[in-house]
Amino acid sequence: EAAQYSFALYTAGVAVESLLRAYVIQLDPILETGHYLPLLLQASKLHQAVTQRESELIDISLITLTRRWKNDLRYTSNQRLRRHLKKLKLDRGVRGDFLKENCRIAIEMATTILKIGVPKWKPS
């Protein structure tokens, strides 16, 4: 069975989106931000809850994840995702399977954000 890299990449982004929405909804339950992660991060005020170093890690991780993630990847085939990543030139300099490597990077970036943001979240 073929690995579903597109779904893995999609869920990495959705996990971060969900975390940021949890923060946003406490501040403004009706704010509509779409699926744009940088706007969600800004609206979440997560930076106010973390250290300077954690804030820098979140920014770097979010930029890296956002380059790869799009909300419409949910039902995307691996072939279409390969084309998407090639168009963004994210296949350059990668040894081996660039699709697998980009998914690994996306998951690593999402994990970094979640490891920082989840413990700081305080439900209202």
Go through the PLM ranges and name each one.
Residues 24-124:
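Long, charged low-complexity segments
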Residues 1-25:
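Short, hydrophobic, well-ordered secondary-structure elements
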